[in-house]
Protein backbone atom coordinates (compact mmCIF):
# COMPACT_ATOMS: atom_id res chain seq x y z
CA UNK A 1 0.00 0.00 0.00
CA UNK A 2 1.38 3.39 -1.04
CA UNK A 3 1.36 6.19 1.53
CA UNK A 4 0.70 9.61 0.04
CA UNK A 5 2.81 12.45 1.40
CA UNK A 6 1.16 15.87 1.45
CA UNK A 7 3.97 18.41 1.35
CA UNK A 8 2.81 21.96 2.17
CA UNK A 9 2.78 23.99 -1.03
CA UNK A 10 1.54 27.18 -2.64
CA UNK A 11 1.37 28.10 -6.31
CA UNK A 12 3.07 31.38 -7.21
CA UNK A 13 3.48 33.26 -10.47
CA UNK A 14 5.42 30.98 -12.85
CA UNK A 15 6.25 28.55 -10.11
CA UNK A 16 5.52 26.86 -6.82
CA UNK A 17 6.63 27.01 -3.20
CA UNK A 18 6.76 23.51 -1.75
CA UNK A 19 8.40 22.42 1.48
CA UNK A 20 11.68 24.32 1.77
CA UNK A 21 11.87 24.83 -2.00
CA UNK A 22 10.90 27.67 -4.30
CA UNK A 23 10.70 26.56 -7.93
CA UNK A 24 10.45 29.24 -10.60
CA UNK A 25 10.49 29.27 -14.40
CA UNK A 26 10.85 32.08 -16.92
CA UNK A 27 9.76 32.00 -20.57
CA UNK A 28 10.36 34.98 -22.84
CA UNK A 29 10.83 35.79 -26.56
CA UNK A 30 14.12 35.09 -28.34
CA UNK A 31 16.95 37.60 -28.13
CA UNK A 32 16.90 40.47 -30.60
CA UNK A 33 19.71 40.70 -33.15
CA UNK A 34 21.46 43.45 -31.17
CA UNK A 35 21.26 41.35 -28.02
CA UNK A 36 22.70 38.34 -29.84
CA UNK A 37 25.63 40.45 -31.01
CA UNK A 38 26.31 41.46 -27.41
CA UNK A 39 26.18 37.82 -26.33
CA UNK A 40 28.60 36.78 -29.09
CA UNK A 41 31.10 39.36 -27.85
CA UNK A 42 30.70 38.35 -24.22
CA UNK A 43 30.96 34.64 -25.01
CA UNK A 44 33.73 35.14 -27.60
CA UNK A 45 31.81 33.06 -30.13
CA UNK A 46 31.56 33.58 -33.88
CA UNK A 47 27.99 32.35 -34.05
CA UNK A 48 24.95 31.58 -31.90
CA UNK A 49 21.89 29.40 -32.53
CA UNK A 50 19.16 30.93 -34.66
CA UNK A 51 16.81 31.12 -31.71
CA UNK A 52 18.35 32.04 -28.37
CA UNK A 53 15.97 32.27 -25.44
CA UNK A 54 18.40 34.22 -23.32
CA UNK A 55 15.93 35.18 -20.60
CA UNK A 56 14.51 31.68 -20.10
CA UNK A 57 15.45 29.54 -17.12
CA UNK A 58 14.34 27.01 -14.54
CA UNK A 59 15.45 27.61 -10.95
CA UNK A 60 15.12 25.50 -7.80
CA UNK A 61 16.06 27.33 -4.60
CA UNK A 62 16.31 26.14 -1.02
CA UNK A 63 17.13 29.17 1.13
CA UNK A 64 17.25 27.12 4.32
CA UNK A 65 20.08 24.96 2.90
CA UNK A 66 21.65 27.83 0.90
CA UNK A 67 21.52 26.06 -2.45
CA UNK A 68 20.09 27.00 -5.83
CA UNK A 69 20.07 24.87 -8.97
CA UNK A 70 19.60 26.72 -12.26
CA UNK A 71 19.40 25.79 -15.92
CA UNK A 72 19.87 28.79 -18.22
CA UNK A 73 20.99 29.63 -21.73
CA UNK A 74 24.05 31.76 -20.99
CA UNK A 75 25.77 29.12 -18.88
CA UNK A 76 25.02 26.47 -21.51
CA UNK A 77 26.51 28.55 -24.33
CA UNK A 78 29.59 29.34 -22.23
CA UNK A 79 30.49 25.66 -22.52
CA UNK A 80 30.50 25.53 -26.33
CA UNK A 81 33.79 24.84 -28.06
CA UNK A 82 35.22 27.84 -29.88
CA UNK A 83 35.79 25.87 -33.09
CA UNK A 84 33.78 23.43 -35.18
CA UNK A 85 33.55 19.76 -34.28
CA UNK A 86 35.72 18.26 -37.03
CA UNK A 87 34.19 14.81 -36.50
CA UNK A 88 30.92 16.13 -37.95
CA UNK A 89 32.32 17.79 -41.05
CA UNK A 90 29.86 17.14 -43.87
CA UNK A 91 31.10 18.07 -47.31
CA UNK A 92 27.60 18.14 -48.77
CA UNK A 93 26.07 20.07 -45.89
CA UNK A 94 24.77 23.49 -46.82
CA UNK A 95 25.51 24.60 -43.29
CA UNK A 96 29.13 23.57 -43.56
CA UNK A 97 29.49 25.36 -46.88
CA UNK A 98 27.80 28.52 -45.64
CA UNK A 99 29.78 28.96 -42.45
CA UNK A 100 33.09 28.60 -44.30
CA UNK A 101 32.24 30.57 -47.45
CA UNK A 102 35.05 32.99 -48.23
CA UNK A 103 37.14 31.78 -45.32
CA UNK A 104 40.82 31.54 -46.26
CA UNK A 105 42.32 30.39 -42.97
CA UNK A 106 42.23 27.07 -41.20
CA UNK A 107 38.83 25.40 -41.14
CA UNK A 108 39.17 24.83 -37.38
CA UNK A 109 38.51 28.52 -36.78
CA UNK A 110 34.88 28.28 -37.89
CA UNK A 111 32.33 28.22 -35.07
CA UNK A 112 30.88 25.11 -33.47
CA UNK A 113 27.80 25.02 -35.66
CA UNK A 114 26.14 22.01 -33.98
CA UNK A 115 25.98 23.97 -30.69
CA UNK A 116 26.74 20.79 -28.74
CA UNK A 117 27.00 21.93 -25.13
CA UNK A 118 28.06 19.54 -22.34
CA UNK A 119 26.07 21.69 -19.87
CA UNK A 120 24.43 19.81 -17.00
CA UNK A 121 23.23 22.72 -14.89
CA UNK A 122 24.53 25.38 -12.52
CA UNK A 123 24.65 25.25 -8.72
CA UNK A 124 24.89 28.36 -6.56
CA UNK A 125 25.94 27.92 -2.93
CA UNK A 126 28.12 29.72 -0.38
CA UNK A 127 28.36 32.66 -2.76
CA UNK A 128 29.97 30.54 -5.48
CA UNK A 129 28.69 29.37 -8.86
CA UNK A 130 29.53 25.82 -9.96
CA UNK A 131 28.80 24.06 -13.24
CA UNK A 132 29.63 20.64 -14.66
CA UNK A 133 33.17 19.68 -13.69
CA UNK A 134 33.50 22.08 -10.75
CA UNK A 135 32.75 19.87 -7.76
CA UNK A 136 33.66 21.14 -4.30
CA UNK A 137 34.34 18.46 -1.70
CA UNK A 138 31.24 17.70 0.31
CA UNK A 139 28.67 18.91 -2.21
CA UNK A 140 28.66 15.83 -4.45
CA UNK A 141 28.85 12.13 -3.68
CA UNK A 142 29.08 9.20 -6.09
CA UNK A 143 26.25 6.72 -5.69
CA UNK A 144 24.82 3.53 -7.13
CA UNK A 145 21.30 4.66 -6.25
CA UNK A 146 19.11 5.18 -9.29
CA UNK A 147 16.17 7.46 -9.95
CA UNK A 148 13.01 5.47 -9.20
CA UNK A 149 11.39 5.32 -12.64
CA UNK A 150 8.39 3.39 -11.31
CA UNK A 151 7.56 6.25 -8.96
CA UNK A 152 7.75 8.67 -11.87
CA UNK A 153 5.29 6.52 -13.81
CA UNK A 154 2.65 6.69 -11.08
CA UNK A 155 -0.40 8.82 -11.97
CA UNK A 156 0.12 11.16 -9.01
CA UNK A 157 -1.51 14.61 -9.31
CA UNK A 158 0.85 17.15 -10.86
CA UNK A 159 1.09 20.35 -8.82
CA UNK A 160 3.32 22.21 -11.28
CA UNK A 161 4.78 21.53 -14.74
CA UNK A 162 6.70 23.57 -17.28
CA UNK A 163 8.71 23.05 -20.45
CA UNK A 164 11.34 25.71 -21.14
CA UNK A 165 13.33 26.07 -24.37
CA UNK A 166 16.83 27.56 -24.05
CA UNK A 167 18.02 27.53 -27.66
CA UNK A 168 17.27 25.98 -31.03
CA UNK A 169 18.77 25.87 -34.52
CA UNK A 170 17.69 23.99 -37.66
CA UNK A 171 21.26 23.79 -39.03
CA UNK A 172 20.27 25.42 -42.34
CA UNK A 173 17.59 22.74 -42.89
CA UNK A 174 20.13 19.98 -42.33
CA UNK A 175 18.85 18.81 -38.97
CA UNK A 176 18.17 20.15 -35.51
CA UNK A 177 20.06 21.31 -32.44
CA UNK A 178 18.04 22.08 -29.33
CA UNK A 179 18.42 22.50 -25.58
CA UNK A 180 15.28 22.36 -23.45
CA UNK A 181 14.40 21.78 -19.79
CA UNK A 182 11.24 20.28 -18.30
CA UNK A 183 10.19 20.22 -14.67
CA UNK A 184 7.42 18.36 -12.86
CA UNK A 185 6.38 18.68 -9.23
CA UNK A 186 4.00 16.52 -7.21
CA UNK A 187 3.32 16.17 -3.48
CA UNK A 188 6.29 13.87 -2.95
CA UNK A 189 9.00 14.96 -5.35
CA UNK A 190 10.40 17.22 -8.04
CA UNK A 191 11.78 15.84 -11.29
CA UNK A 192 13.75 17.84 -13.86
CA UNK A 193 14.96 16.77 -17.30
CA UNK A 194 17.41 18.87 -19.29
CA UNK A 195 17.95 17.57 -22.82
CA UNK A 196 20.39 18.62 -25.49
CA UNK A 197 19.43 16.94 -28.75
CA UNK A 198 21.33 17.00 -32.04
CA UNK A 199 20.34 15.54 -35.38
CA UNK A 200 22.52 16.14 -38.44
CA UNK A 201 20.68 14.50 -41.32
CA UNK A 202 22.49 11.48 -42.80
CA UNK A 203 25.39 11.99 -40.39
CA UNK A 204 24.83 11.76 -36.62
CA UNK A 205 22.37 11.84 -33.73
CA UNK A 206 23.39 12.86 -30.23
CA UNK A 207 21.68 13.39 -26.88
CA UNK A 208 22.80 14.61 -23.47
CA UNK A 209 20.16 14.11 -20.76
CA UNK A 210 20.51 15.52 -17.26
CA UNK A 211 17.93 14.30 -14.77
CA UNK A 212 17.57 15.73 -11.29
CA UNK A 213 15.24 14.05 -8.81
CA UNK A 214 14.45 14.96 -5.23
CA UNK A 215 12.05 13.37 -2.78
CA UNK A 216 10.95 16.00 -0.28
CA UNK A 217 12.32 15.26 3.18
CA UNK A 218 15.48 13.55 1.92
CA UNK A 219 18.86 15.17 2.49
CA UNK A 220 20.02 14.96 -1.11
CA UNK A 221 19.04 15.19 -4.76
CA UNK A 222 19.95 12.57 -7.35
CA UNK A 223 21.64 13.80 -10.51
CA UNK A 224 21.87 11.43 -13.47
CA UNK A 225 23.72 12.36 -16.67
CA UNK A 226 23.31 10.17 -19.76
CA UNK A 227 25.13 10.66 -23.06
CA UNK A 228 23.91 8.89 -26.20
CA UNK A 229 25.27 9.04 -29.73
CA UNK A 230 25.15 7.13 -33.00
CA UNK A 231 25.54 7.54 -36.70
CA UNK A 232 22.36 8.40 -38.57
CA UNK A 233 22.36 4.91 -40.07
CA UNK A 234 20.86 3.41 -36.92
CA UNK A 235 17.80 5.65 -37.23
CA UNK A 236 17.25 5.74 -40.97
CA UNK A 237 15.71 2.24 -41.37
CA UNK A 238 12.81 3.21 -39.09
CA UNK A 239 11.74 5.91 -41.54
CA UNK A 240 10.88 3.47 -44.33
CA UNK A 241 7.35 3.00 -42.98
CA UNK A 242 7.02 6.35 -41.21
CA UNK A 243 9.23 9.26 -42.43
CA UNK A 244 8.03 11.48 -39.56
CA UNK A 245 10.07 9.40 -37.12
CA UNK A 246 13.22 11.09 -38.42
CA UNK A 247 12.07 14.34 -36.83
CA UNK A 248 10.72 12.80 -33.63
CA UNK A 249 13.44 13.51 -31.06
CA UNK A 250 11.89 11.32 -28.36
CA UNK A 251 11.76 8.36 -30.71
CA UNK A 252 15.32 8.91 -31.91
CA UNK A 253 16.66 9.19 -28.37
CA UNK A 254 14.95 5.93 -27.42
CA UNK A 255 16.94 4.15 -30.14
CA UNK A 256 20.37 5.64 -29.44
CA UNK A 257 22.95 3.55 -27.56
CA UNK A 258 24.22 4.82 -24.21
CA UNK A 259 27.85 5.94 -24.35
CA UNK A 260 28.15 7.05 -20.72
CA UNK A 261 25.99 7.20 -17.59
CA UNK A 262 26.89 8.79 -14.26
CA UNK A 263 24.80 9.19 -11.12
CA UNK A 264 25.68 11.25 -8.08
CA UNK A 265 24.07 12.85 -5.07
CA UNK A 266 23.90 16.60 -4.50
CA UNK A 267 24.15 16.79 -0.72
CA UNK A 268 21.95 19.34 1.02
CA UNK A 269 24.06 18.86 4.17
CA UNK A 270 26.95 20.68 2.43
CA UNK A 271 26.14 23.94 4.20
CA UNK A 272 25.04 22.57 7.58
CA UNK A 273 28.41 23.12 9.25
CA UNK A 274 29.77 26.05 7.29
Swiss-Prot record:
InterPro entries: Phosphatase_reg/MetRdx, TIP41-like. It holds the Pfam family TIP41. GO terms for cellular component: cytosol. One of its GO terms (molecular function) is protein phosphatase activator activity. GO terms for biological process: TOR signaling. Belongs to the TIP41 family. This is TIP41-like protein. It comes from Dictyostelium discoideum (Social amoeba). The lineage of its organism: Eukaryota, Amoebozoa, Evosea, Eumycetozoa, Dictyostelia. The gene is tiprl.
Amino acid sequence: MTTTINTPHKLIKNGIEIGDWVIHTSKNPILKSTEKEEWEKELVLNGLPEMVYGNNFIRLSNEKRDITIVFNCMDALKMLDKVADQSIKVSSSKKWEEINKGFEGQIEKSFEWTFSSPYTGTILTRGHCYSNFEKPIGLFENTTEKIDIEKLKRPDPILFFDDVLLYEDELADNGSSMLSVKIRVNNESVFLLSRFFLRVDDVICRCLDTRIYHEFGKDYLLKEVTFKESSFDIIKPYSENDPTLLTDSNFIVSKLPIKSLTTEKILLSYNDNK
